[in-house]
Amino acid sequence: MEVIRYPDSPFKLHQPFPPAGDQPTAIAGLLEGLSDGLAYQTLLGVTGSGKTYTMANVIAQSGRPAIIMAHNKTLAAQLYAEMREFFPENAVEYFVSYYDYYQPEAYVPSRDLFIEKDSAINEHIEQMRLSATKNLMTRDDVIIVATVSAIYGIGDPTEYQQMVLSVKEGDTIEQRDIIATLVSMQYERGDLDFKRGSFRVRGDVIDVYPAESSENALRISLFDDEIDRLDMFDPLSGSLHQRVGRYTVFPSSHYVTPRDTVLRACDSIKEELRERIDFFTKENRPVEQQRIEQRTRFDLEMLYEMGFCKGIENYSRHFSGKKEGEPPPTLMDYLPSNAIMFIDESHVTVTQIGGMYKGDASRKQNLVDYGFRLPSARDNRPLKFHEFEKVMPQTVFVSATPAKYEEEHAGQVVEQVVRPTGLVDPQIIIRPVATQVDDLMSEINDRIQKGERVLVTTLTKRMAEQLTDYYSELGIKVRYLHSDIDTVERVEIIRDLRLGLFDVLVGINLLREGLDIPEVSLVAILDADKEGFLRSHRSLIQTIGRAARNVNGVAILYADKITDSMKAAIDETERRREKQIKFNEEHGIVPQQIKKQVKDIIDGVYHEEDSGKGRRQGKNKVKVGEIHNEEDAIKEIAKLEKAMQQAARDLQFEEAAVLRDRIRNIKENLLFGAE
């Protein structure tokens, strides 16, 4: 592993191997585009060509902070894990929605039903979000991996920065002033329960557990009114890590605001409330008038007394001082002016960003019309697409199949078609629909004998279920992946396929972007000639690409006629194959099969040889006790089940799956007397 630092760059790139294939020309092309000031570029990178590694090299060589946007949490977590491997010494941050569960408040007029907001916040992800904004304000070497959560409103960065507590050894400050500042930053005093976002006081010592920190707490030791020393310590064991000369404590929430801003906002809210009461009075709607008055006055009372209230985000326009209709502050406002943005799988992500505002607006309008919220609540919203375009820094769209928007906005298109491994795009075979099920059966048996895996994509849920049942009855180990399966189970299923617990995975629209399964040598597309979203040329190219990570990769399209979409997908795949084969011949490259360990999404690596033993490699080790009898086994299972549920809550899905296997192994081998 080589560690590279480029001139004038704060990043240290841990390079497992030098760029190869099309990577060097892609990196050089993107860097040239950035220095030429191109607003938009497209990296057209085929599956398995190492697009993430190219991004890492561009970031390291440009020396500029970066944000990488993905269209779902699973893909974001995968990118985050890879970026942390490339930049372990830099600030790689994860910014996604911190809700494990979220039910927004809504009103259904037809049933006169008001649904209260209900949510469960994931502590670990909240800490990572706060860490992201802190590092954007204090460091140059920052890489943020985010989902569309980045375009939703958070606190104003200017006021957030005003609310910090900066302490330095030798400063003169009274203990009560430090405590008052911490309370105004929404830190809780917890002398008994010392947790993230709290502080405790013991004589002349104040311990602060910063909201954005997961491993370190700050000890402020005072001598009379002077700061005698500052130490970082382990909040769990209490052992000192290091002495620091100065430290900045950031607020425990993005919505913390100075007292004078709260008072100014309250006056503005009162003014809007008066206008709304007058409106409902004129309209002769006493129920709505009483409702808006009661709800808003309660919130105002909380704001006066506590500085915050439930649903404070609905008053964000009053706090930020923005005019009606102006965009709310978002993570984009925290980005430095020289940042770079990468939009991964842009053909999906760009469309997703564009659709966020409308769904939110229709729900809010009902709440405003029926007196549950003031009209200003409509401005607590995600960015509209044209607003997002205005705040986009220099952007690189990353996709194997760029859509219309990227084609219209590409200052230049940089191709990354040749893979570092020498692997070429899969060979495409077309066969008739009439015999597709039985023909596929014989193909599956061939692959099973070679120890390879198969992906099958169907058009309907019903067909996927019937196909799964049929193959299962014939003794094939097959699973079915559908939209009702949650993220945890989806990751488990893909991991189990890679480990060989089953051989065939059947799906509808879930076998496309971001699935990295080198063991898959055959992708079968049933009813490929049925035009539509699932069989568009982009969908076909993405699905065919799932077999591109295997040296024996083949895609079989079952069709009775060649549609325009099929022709476009086949032509593009053939164009890429020709270029890849020619490059290999010119450079004497023999395609190499990818051998990739099954990784944990957030931390560590799961080794195939540990399957069934459930050992963890990495930070989050679960210590396995010595098991001598049935009582020990039952205790161990209870402990592991608790750890498994916690891992799932923290979105560490693959860790949860490892623990599940460990539980299963104990049950089979110890409780039920298996050999």
From Swiss-Prot:
This protein's UniProt keywords: ATP-binding, Cytoplasm, DNA damage, DNA excision, DNA repair, Excision nuclease, Nucleotide-binding, SOS response
GO terms under biological process: nucleotide-excision repair; SOS response
Subcellular location: Cytoplasm
Positions contributing to ATP binding: 45-52
Domain UVR intervals: 634-669
Residue ranges of every copy of the Helicase C-terminal domain listed in the record: 436-602
Domain Helicase ATP-binding, first and last residues per copy: 32-417
Pfam families: Helicase_C, ResIII, UVR, UvrB, UvrB_inter
GO CC, alphabetical: cytoplasm; excinuclease repair complex
Main localization of the protein described in the UniProt heading: cytoplasm
Keyword Plastid: no
GO molecular function: ATP binding; ATP hydrolysis activity; DNA binding; excinuclease ABC activity
Motif (Beta-hairpin): 98-121
Entry superkingdom: Bacteria
PROSITE patterns (UniProt xref): HELICASE_ATP_BIND_1, HELICASE_CTER, UVR
Free-text comment on this protein's domains from its UniProt entry: The beta-hairpin motif is involved in DNA binding.
HAMAP family: UvrB
Quaternary structure, from the entry: Forms a heterotetramer with UvrA during the search for lesions. Interacts with UvrC in an incision complex.
Protein purpose: The UvrABC repair system catalyzes the recognition and processing of DNA lesions. A damage recognition complex composed of 2 UvrA and 2 UvrB subunits scans DNA for abnormalities. Upon binding of the UvrA(2)B(2) complex to a putative damaged site, the DNA wraps around one UvrB monomer. DNA wrap is dependent on ATP binding by UvrB and probably causes local melting of the DNA helix, facilitating insertion of UvrB beta-hairpin between the DNA strands. Then UvrB probes one DNA strand for the presence of a lesion.
Similarity remark: Belongs to the UvrB family.
Protein name (Swiss-Prot/TrEMBL): UvrABC system protein B
Organism this protein belongs to: Neisseria meningitidis serogroup A / serotype 4A (strain DSM 15465 / Z2491)
Organism taxonomic ancestry: Bacteria, Pseudomonadati, Pseudomonadota, Betaproteobacteria, Neisseriales
